[in-house]
């Protein structure tokens, strides 16, 4: 759940203008409309807009939003989405700045790092198409981040004011595309989750280095490995949809065929997950932990 997009945009902008379409604390469901063409399908549930900014700097314009989904006042899913319009404005300088923000940031970026599980990138000239999948120590990243610029005071204030709880461990994905051959727009998107929404097992190790989800450790924890494999498949499929949404040029697309399952596999995996959840509910009902009414309501929620 690293807020890398907010950090990247701080690299460019200092003058804030009126926020765009969505307002802080607005609740959104089903779709998030960044513009007429970019309409992001949201995972099920009610999403709260936490950050909403429109910024301008010497002819460069950007939109940035962060959204969260809560369960019992705990963040279980997080999305950041941003668009920057750069066409015709100081192109050489902007190209270099974007390159440095994505590939030369010493804290996070589109390059191999020990804590990153998967990095897929196309890079040629000023063009890049990037997917990063990783895990994180959420509370450390939030309260004591390695990058001193990672402040996001508005988000911290919102969490504090609303007494929101954070997960200890998060799985995340980062998606970015920029090309002068594609209208000079830079799109950035990131997702973060509490692994429990994928029925992930308990975590005994929290730090990035010791986490069961670290690529050097995960083979020792088959249940965590299964959860990460689900997340990799979901993230790869989301990147494919991201490429379609913003009309990425064909030769710039990433080859994610080995990461993204077919629709039939996704359907089978989903069916297996539903069966597992219903079996767990049935055990709770048999053991007297749930009443019949509670069991039926919970089962209906899963099936819907």
What is the predicted function of each stretch?
Residues 85-261:
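Mature extracytoplasmic/lumenal regions of exported proteins
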Residues 4-13:
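Sec-dependent N-terminal signal peptides
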Residues 15-19:
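Sec/Tat signal peptide C-region and signal peptidase I cleavage site
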Residues 263-292, 296-304:
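N-terminal J-domain/J-like co-chaperone modules of DnaJ/Hsp40 proteins
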Residues 20-119:
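N-terminal Sec/ER secretory leader and immediately downstream segment
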Residues 1-4, 304:
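Positively charged n-region of N-terminal signal peptides that target proteins for export
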């Amino acid at each position: 759940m690293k807020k890398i997009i907010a950090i990247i945009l701080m690299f460019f902008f200092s003058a804030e203008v009126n926020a765009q379409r969505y307002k802080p604390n607005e609740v959104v469901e089903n779709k998030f409309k960044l513009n007429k063409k970019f309409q992001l399908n949201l995972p099920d549930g009610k999403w709260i807009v936490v950050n909403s900014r429109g910024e301008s700097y010497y002819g460069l314009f950007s939109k940035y939003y962060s959204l969260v989904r809560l369960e019992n006042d705990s963040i279980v899913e997080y999305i950041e989405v941003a668009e920057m319009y750069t066409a015709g404005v100081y192109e050489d300088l902007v190209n270099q700045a974007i390159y440095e923000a994505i590939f030369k940031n010493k804290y996070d970026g589109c390059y191999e790092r020990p804590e990153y599980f998967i990095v897929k990138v196309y890079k040629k000239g000023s063009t890049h198409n990037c997917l990063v999948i990783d895990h994180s120590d959420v509370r450390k990243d939030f309260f004591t981040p390695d990058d001193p610029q990672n402040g996001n005071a508005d988000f911290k204030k919102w969490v504090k004011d609303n007494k929101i709880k954070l997960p200890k461990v998060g799985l995340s994905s980062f998606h970015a595309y920029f090309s002068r051959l594609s209208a000079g727009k830079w799109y950035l998107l990131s997702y973060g989750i509490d692994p429990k929404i994928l029925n992930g097992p308990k975590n005994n190790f929290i730090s990035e280095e010791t986490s069961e989800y670290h690529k050097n450790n995960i083979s020792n924890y088959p249940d965590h490995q299964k959860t990460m494999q689900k997340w990799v498949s979901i993230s790869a499929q989301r990147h494919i949809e991201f490429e379609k949404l913003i009309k990425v040029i064909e030769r710039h697309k990433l080859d994610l065929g080995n990461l993204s399952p077919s629709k039939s596999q996704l359907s089978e995996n989903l069916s297996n997950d539903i069966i597992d959840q219903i079996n767990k509910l049935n055990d709770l009902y048999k053991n007297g932990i749930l009443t019949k009414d509670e069991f039926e309501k919970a089962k209906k929620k899963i099936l819907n």
